[in-house]
Amino acid sequence: MQDKPTSTDLIESIQDFLMKEALPQFKDKDLLSYKTLVSWNMLGVVSREIRSGEELLDRELNRLAKLLNKDFSLPPSLDEKKKLVNVWNVELRDKIRKEKLSLEDSTYWNHVKETVIEKVEITNPRFNTES
């Protein structure tokens, strides 16, 4: 693996190209303009996921471990973390259903709220999650 350019540097270069060079060429072509903007946005999501995704996944795993009383150490690979978070989210879902937990159970609600906020930070950072 090389030091520079990083994968996020490359993605940001493509985004820059789309906005500064490609999009102006499509000013009279609505569909191509739209697809260019969507592509630019998707690259932004990928870039933010590369930069922050694993850290946010680690936070979610730590919160889930506490809620589900799991004794664990973080798996070494990103794929293993993703699989584990999916399994534990199913366990949490089942626990909430079985125990009929509600919004009054603030530890569970806070976890869900924090997880959603973190996901929105990746997919749509301009969305205001402050209440």
Identify the role of each PLM range.
Residues 7-17, 24-28, 32-34, 60-131:
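C-terminal amphipathic alpha-helical interaction region
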Residues 15, 19-20, 40-44:
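Predominant activation on well-ordered alpha-helical scaffold segments within soluble catalytic domains
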Residues 34-36, 40-54, 63-68:
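N-terminal alpha-helical targeting/anchoring segments
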